[in-house]
Protein backbone atom coordinates (compact mmCIF):
# COMPACT_ATOMS: atom_id res chain seq x y z
CA UNK A 1 0.00 0.00 0.00
CA UNK A 2 1.28 3.48 -0.89
CA UNK A 3 0.48 4.82 2.58
CA UNK A 4 2.62 2.14 4.20
CA UNK A 5 5.55 3.06 1.95
CA UNK A 6 4.95 6.77 2.54
CA UNK A 7 4.98 6.22 6.29
CA UNK A 8 8.39 4.52 6.19
CA UNK A 9 9.85 6.97 3.66
CA UNK A 10 8.69 9.88 5.84
CA UNK A 11 9.92 8.15 8.99
CA UNK A 12 13.42 7.85 7.49
CA UNK A 13 13.88 10.97 5.37
CA UNK A 14 11.97 13.74 7.17
CA UNK A 15 14.15 13.53 10.30
CA UNK A 16 17.21 13.82 8.04
CA UNK A 17 15.78 16.90 6.30
CA UNK A 18 14.61 18.63 9.49
CA UNK A 19 17.81 17.73 11.35
CA UNK A 20 19.86 19.29 8.56
CA UNK A 21 17.90 22.55 8.90
CA UNK A 22 18.21 22.53 12.69
CA UNK A 23 21.93 21.74 12.72
CA UNK A 24 22.62 24.46 10.15
CA UNK A 25 20.43 27.20 11.67
CA UNK A 26 20.30 26.46 15.42
CA UNK A 27 23.68 24.75 15.57
CA UNK A 28 26.29 26.05 13.17
CA UNK A 29 24.93 29.51 12.26
CA UNK A 30 23.59 30.40 15.71
CA UNK A 31 26.93 29.64 17.30
CA UNK A 32 28.99 31.30 14.57
CA UNK A 33 26.91 34.48 14.54
CA UNK A 34 26.98 34.51 18.35
CA UNK A 35 30.77 34.42 18.35
CA UNK A 36 30.89 37.13 15.69
CA UNK A 37 28.49 39.54 17.46
CA UNK A 38 29.29 38.39 21.02
CA UNK A 39 25.63 38.31 22.06
CA UNK A 40 22.70 35.91 21.95
CA UNK A 41 19.90 38.03 20.49
CA UNK A 42 21.57 38.78 17.14
CA UNK A 43 21.99 35.11 16.18
CA UNK A 44 18.49 34.34 17.46
CA UNK A 45 16.93 36.93 15.16
CA UNK A 46 19.26 36.52 12.18
CA UNK A 47 18.88 32.73 12.06
CA UNK A 48 15.10 33.13 12.39
CA UNK A 49 15.09 35.51 9.43
CA UNK A 50 17.33 33.18 7.39
CA UNK A 51 15.12 30.20 8.26
CA UNK A 52 12.09 32.13 7.01
CA UNK A 53 13.84 33.19 3.82
CA UNK A 54 14.91 29.58 3.16
CA UNK A 55 11.21 28.75 2.88
CA UNK A 56 10.47 31.65 0.52
CA UNK A 57 10.38 29.32 -2.48
CA UNK A 58 7.81 26.98 -0.94
CA UNK A 59 4.55 26.87 -2.94
CA UNK A 60 2.65 28.07 0.14
CA UNK A 61 4.16 31.52 -0.41
CA UNK A 62 2.92 31.55 -4.01
CA UNK A 63 -0.58 30.51 -2.91
CA UNK A 64 -0.97 32.72 0.17
CA UNK A 65 1.49 35.53 -0.46
CA UNK A 66 4.54 36.91 1.31
CA UNK A 67 2.53 37.38 4.52
CA UNK A 68 3.22 33.70 5.12
CA UNK A 69 6.91 34.50 5.61
CA UNK A 70 5.82 35.70 9.08
CA UNK A 71 4.94 32.08 9.87
CA UNK A 72 8.34 30.77 8.79
CA UNK A 73 10.36 33.52 10.49
CA UNK A 74 8.44 33.16 13.76
CA UNK A 75 8.72 29.37 13.56
CA UNK A 76 12.48 29.87 13.31
CA UNK A 77 12.29 32.20 16.33
CA UNK A 78 10.30 29.55 18.20
CA UNK A 79 12.92 26.88 17.42
CA UNK A 80 15.69 29.31 18.41
CA UNK A 81 14.05 30.10 21.76
CA UNK A 82 13.67 26.37 22.46
CA UNK A 83 17.34 25.84 21.64
CA UNK A 84 18.66 28.71 23.76
CA UNK A 85 16.39 28.18 26.75
CA UNK A 86 16.97 24.42 26.85
CA UNK A 87 20.73 24.67 26.18
CA UNK A 88 20.41 22.15 23.36
CA UNK A 89 18.72 21.39 20.08
CA UNK A 90 16.74 18.31 21.13
CA UNK A 91 13.39 20.10 21.52
CA UNK A 92 13.67 21.97 18.22
CA UNK A 93 14.88 18.83 16.42
CA UNK A 94 11.96 16.79 17.72
CA UNK A 95 9.34 19.46 17.20
CA UNK A 96 10.50 20.23 13.65
CA UNK A 97 10.59 16.54 12.69
CA UNK A 98 7.21 15.89 14.31
CA UNK A 99 5.65 18.89 12.58
CA UNK A 100 6.87 17.90 9.12
CA UNK A 101 5.99 14.24 9.73
CA UNK A 102 2.44 15.22 10.69
CA UNK A 103 2.12 17.38 7.56
CA UNK A 104 3.43 14.55 5.39
CA UNK A 105 1.37 11.71 6.86
CA UNK A 106 -1.74 13.28 8.35
CA UNK A 107 -2.82 16.25 6.24
CA UNK A 108 -1.59 18.04 3.13
CA UNK A 109 -2.99 20.07 0.23
CA UNK A 110 -2.28 20.55 -3.47
CA UNK A 111 -0.60 23.90 -2.75
CA UNK A 112 1.91 22.73 -0.10
CA UNK A 113 5.56 21.78 -0.47
CA UNK A 114 4.97 18.23 0.80
CA UNK A 115 2.94 16.55 -1.95
CA UNK A 116 2.14 13.22 -0.34
CA UNK A 117 -0.71 10.74 -0.23
CA UNK A 118 -1.60 11.75 3.32
CA UNK A 119 -4.52 10.42 5.32
CA UNK A 120 -6.39 13.72 4.99
CA UNK A 121 -6.29 16.30 2.22
CA UNK A 122 -7.34 19.92 2.58
CA UNK A 123 -9.39 20.96 -0.45
CA UNK A 124 -10.66 24.28 0.89
CA UNK A 125 -9.45 27.71 -0.07
CA UNK A 126 -6.53 28.44 2.27
CA UNK A 127 -6.41 31.53 4.44
CA UNK A 128 -3.17 32.98 5.76
CA UNK A 129 -4.79 33.64 9.14
CA UNK A 130 -5.29 29.96 9.87
CA UNK A 131 -1.63 29.28 9.11
CA UNK A 132 -0.49 32.19 11.29
CA UNK A 133 -2.56 30.93 14.25
CA UNK A 134 0.17 28.60 15.58
CA UNK A 135 2.89 31.24 15.72
CA UNK A 136 0.81 33.75 17.66
CA UNK A 137 -1.12 31.41 19.97
CA UNK A 138 0.10 27.81 19.96
CA UNK A 139 3.87 28.42 20.01
CA UNK A 140 3.69 30.77 23.02
CA UNK A 141 1.61 28.17 24.88
CA UNK A 142 4.19 25.48 24.07
CA UNK A 143 7.00 27.75 25.29
CA UNK A 144 5.04 28.38 28.51
CA UNK A 145 4.49 24.64 28.96
CA UNK A 146 8.16 23.80 28.37
CA UNK A 147 9.27 26.61 30.69
CA UNK A 148 7.26 25.04 33.51
CA UNK A 149 8.14 21.44 32.64
CA UNK A 150 11.88 22.08 32.34
CA UNK A 151 12.04 24.87 34.94
CA UNK A 152 13.62 27.39 32.58
CA UNK A 153 15.25 30.30 34.42
CA UNK A 154 17.40 33.30 33.51
CA UNK A 155 15.46 34.12 30.33
CA UNK A 156 17.13 37.51 29.90
CA UNK A 157 20.66 36.11 29.90
CA UNK A 158 19.85 33.03 27.79
CA UNK A 159 18.06 35.04 25.09
CA UNK A 160 19.83 38.42 25.22
CA UNK A 161 23.05 37.88 27.18
CA UNK A 162 26.63 38.49 26.13
CA UNK A 163 28.81 35.78 24.62
CA UNK A 164 32.43 35.27 25.46
CA UNK A 165 34.61 32.69 23.79
CA UNK A 166 34.63 30.57 26.94
CA UNK A 167 30.78 30.51 26.98
CA UNK A 168 28.71 28.26 24.76
CA UNK A 169 25.53 29.42 23.07
Label for each model-derived stretch:
Residues 1-2:
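Short, small-residue-biased leader/transition segments that mark boundaries at the very start
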Residues 7-167:
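Transmembrane helix-loop-helix hairpins at the membrane interface
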